[in-house]
Amino acid sequence: VLKLLKDSEGEVEICPSRRHILFRIDNYTVISALLEGEFLDYKSALPKDKKTEVTVSTRTMIESVERVSLLITDRLKSPVRCVIGEDTVKLFCTTTMGRATDQISAEISGDQLEIGFNNKYLLDALRAAETDEVRLQLGGPISPMLVLPKEGDAFSFLVLPVRLRSEM
């Protein structure tokens, strides 16, 4: 619905019923089921223990993850290893085909850290962040990472880490 609204300047008709909601936008009709019940207070599930914070260009981070992910296939799965230093994030991926390495500049505060992620989940979160820069908040090598806008609270994406083997 949001994508249709972005491309439309016409009126939107909204028709709620007991179990469904209907949106009419230009020549499109979208019908959705309404959910009912108690939902998890997601804010209480978000990690609050932040030991490391990385502020980085969203586009640069996406491109770097894509580059090191070139060796990953459905058959050759391997995590993207992120080594967060003083002012750089080094990304690695090692498969039986070889090793890919990239390094990007970032604004980093807190502890240095090494953590691994599934490349697809990491890319999904970064691509959904429609801001020029993101803040990555990390609590440790086995704690979830929060992806937030540089300023404000327009979104919060949680990316779970992958346990890394010791070799690098």
Residue ranges of each PLM-predicted region?
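Specificity-determining recognition surfaces
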Residues: D41-Y42
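DNA polymerase processivity clamps
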Residues: V1-L35, K50-M168
